[in-house]
Structures are given as structure tokens and as C-alpha cells.
């Protein structure tokens, strides 16, 4: 039994993909508010009801649309000549309880409450949980033939990263991917711990959307906070 399942995603039409995609966090300062189609408008909305209106507007104008059947999605991002290949699908939260989906980060009650409130009011997950899994070297080569086909999306964002996405519709390719996914025994959460905890605390049966990258493609970088100023003197211990 595979931990990652297909689902019907809500996604932009190809011609709007670059405009809708929100910028990398490092480039948010360069974001121009007049980009009305950008998803960052929805993410930055001060009220949940405003976010819901923006999402509804994008759907009504056919900027974004929901797939009519369940699919896997393959996402490739290229930057500085490095390529990362992610598998986008949904997971069952029961696998969190049985330790097949593992976190590593401390979570905070207030942030979980806020995420839960957003989830219940908005009734949508607007970005995937970022995860990784242990992969045998070069095991993804079995999927190489997929990348001979034209991707459904292919564009370069403001941060110079190239984004490509394939919607897996071919039955043979889907079967091959399902066989590959059977070898993934555990999934590790990289980013999205508070969202997962919020989903666990709702009474709704939620299957979170994730993107899973193999560990041999992921770089683990230090994240250090620096103390540069103390406003008041402190006593020695």
C-alpha cells in the first residue's frame, strides 16, 4: 500500500501559470501589488473571507480550475543547474499516528489554533506540505521517460528558477509511478508541521496535499538566528 495517493488538484490554466504562482519568500519584497492574479494576494489577505472571495473570483474567471479526475503530479524545479523532482499527491493522516509520516519540529499552540481556524473557514489547502523520503540512488531513472513529454507547465519565475509540472494521465505511467511509490516506507515533514497539527485537530476527514522530494536531491541548510542588539542590560548567570 502506497503512502502517497492521487487527487484532483485545483490549478491555473497554462497561460496564467506564471502570473498566478506566488514568488519565492526571498523575492516577496519585489512583489508588485498590481499583479491581481498572483496567489500572494490570497495568502496575504487580512481576512479569511477576503481570501475566499479572491479564490472564488479566480475560479469564476476560469483562471484556475479543478481537474475532473484524480491524478499524480510530477513537479521539477531547476535552479543553479540543480534539479529537484517532487511527487505531488495526498496522504492519509492515519499514517501520522502510526509513525509512517514523521515530523521533527516543535509546534506552538497558538499557531496551531490559527492554522486550524484558517483551515475550517477557508476549506482549502492552498500550498503543499514540503516532505522528503529516503530514496535509493538513481531510483528515479525509472521515471525518466516521462520527461520526454512536454510538461503541462514550463516557465521561469522572478528568482530565475524554472518550474515544470506534468499531470500524470497515462495509465501505464501511473502504474509505473504507483510501483515506485510502494518503496517509500516513511515520509519526513520538512515544512508544514503546524498545518499538519491543525488538520489532525479538525473533525473533518482531511487528506493533506504534499510534495515529496527524494533525500538525495534535498540540501539541508543551517538556519541560524543572530542576536544583534539587547535593549536592556541583563544580569550574568
Where are these regions (language model features)?
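A short alpha->loop->secondary-structure connector
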Residues: 147-151, 204-209
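N-terminal extension/subdomain marker
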Residues: 1-150
Amino acid at each position: 500500500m502506497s503512502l502517497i495517493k492521487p487527487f484532483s488538484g485545483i490549478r491555473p490554466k497554462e497561460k496564467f501559470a506564471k502570473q498566478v504562482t506566488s514568488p519565492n519568500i526571498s523575492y516577496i519584497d519585489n512583489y508588485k501589488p498590481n499583479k491581481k492574479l498572483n496567489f500572494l494576494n490570497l495568502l496575504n489577505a487580512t481576512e479569511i473571507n477576503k481570501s475566499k472571495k479572491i479564490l472564488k473570483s479566480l475560479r469564476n474567471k476560469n483562471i484556475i480550475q479543478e481537474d475532473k479526475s484524480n491524478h499524480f503530479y510530477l513537479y521539477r524545479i531547476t535552479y543553479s543547474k540543480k534539479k529537484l523532482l517532487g511527487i505531488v499527491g495526498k496522504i492519509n493522516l492515519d499514517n501520522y499516528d502510526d509513525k509512517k509520516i514523521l515530523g521533527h519540529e516543535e509546534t506552538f499552540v497558538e499557531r496551531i489554533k490559527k492554522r486550524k481556524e484558517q483551515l475550517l473557514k477557508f476549506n482549502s489547502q492552498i500550498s503543499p506540505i514540503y516532505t522528503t523520503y529516503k530514496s535509493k540512488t538513481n531510483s528515479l531513472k525509472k521515471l525518466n521517460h516521462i520527461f520526454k513529454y512536454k510538461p503541462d507547465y514550463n516557465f521561469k519565475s522572478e528568482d530565475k528558477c524554472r518550474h515544470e509540472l506534468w499531470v500524470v494521465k497515462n495509465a501505464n505511467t501511473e502504474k509505473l509511478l504507483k510501483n515506485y511509490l510502494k518503496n517509500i516506507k516513511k515520509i519526513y515533514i520538512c515544512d508544514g508541521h503546524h498545518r499538519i497539527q491543525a488538520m489532525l485537530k479538525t473533525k473533518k476527514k482531511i487528506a493533506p496535499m504534499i510534495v515529496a522530494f527524494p533525500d538525495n536531491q534535498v540540501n539541508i541548510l543551517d538556519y541560524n538566528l543572530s542576536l544583534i542588539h539587547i535593549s536592556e542590560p541583563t544580569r550574568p548567570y
